[in-house]
Design a protein with these regions (language model features):
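Acidic/histidine-rich catalytic cores and adjacent linkers
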Residues: 1-6, 10, 16-20, 39-221
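Short alpha-helix plus adjacent loop in nuclease-associated cores
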Residues: 18-39
Length: 221
């Protein structure tokens, strides 16, 4: 339908959703690896069971660190952390977690390379990394990589242009908050007037047209 209405439009995939897709794939892999440490074998000793529980809790507690750019993970916050006996930094926690599984480790560093290529707006480099790893990376990334390949031209546009859905989505969220904090509006014109006021769109003390839209008795209804 979009192509019919806007036949000459340049389609751009929002960059946020590209990174979100990578993060979701990595996080799903993290969950699969984590669950492995929540399984107890009949041959496990008490010490082994305790070790598994500790690693499981580490994955569950520090999962957000795995989704950050590596250079954004602190190397200076040396101190006591939950589920670690020794003092440790956030960067060391990441290394500890990815060292629990080679597939996770490979996927983590592949994702980091994709982040770098994406941030540098390096379209060719981005897809070279995908092509080089699509047959060897964890299964959680298969659908994501195939989707990227099927939408190459749109992703290229995302890296070429600075346009984004962010401002529009921000406006939509603000309107939703206005409606929520007002406990709903029975009168559409009252809601419209409140939106105009909040966004400073045409409202002034002398604007009779906007004033006529406002049902003051029902403004917060």
């Amino acid at each position: 339908m979009i192509k019919d209405i806007f036949p000459n439009a340049t389609v751009i995939i929002d960059r946020f959703h590209i990174i979100q897709a990578l993060n979701n794939s990595l996080n799903n892999l993290r969950i699969r690896v984590m669950k492995r440490f929540n399984t107890i074998s009949k041959d496990d000793t008490k010490d082994k069971i305790k070790e598994k529980e500790q690693i499981y809790n580490q994955f569950k507690t520090y999962w957000k660190l795995l989704l950050k750019r590596e250079d954004e993970v602190s190397i200076d916050d040396y101190g006591k952390k939950d589920y670690f006996k020794q003092w440790i930094t956030s960067r060391e926690i990441v290394k500890h977690l990815i060292n629990q599984d080679e597939v996770l480790k490979d996927a983590y560093y592949t994702t980091q390379m994709l982040y770098d290529a994406f941030d540098a707006r390096n379209y060719k480099g981005f897809f070279n990394i995908i092509d080089s790893n699509i047959n060897t990376i964890a299964e959680e990334f298969s659908a994501t990589f195939k989707t990227f390949i099927n939408n190459k031209s749109y992703i290229e546009n995302s890296l070429r242009y600075n346009l984004s859905n962010g401002p529009i989505e921000g406006i939509i969220n603000k309107v939703k908050n206005i409606k929520r904090t007002g406990y709903g509006y029975r009168n559409f014109f009252s809601l419209k007037a409140r939106v105009l006021i909040v966004f400073n769109l045409g409202y002034s003390n002398t604007d009779r047209n906007v004033k006529e839209l406002i049902d003051y008795d029902n403004l917060a209804a």
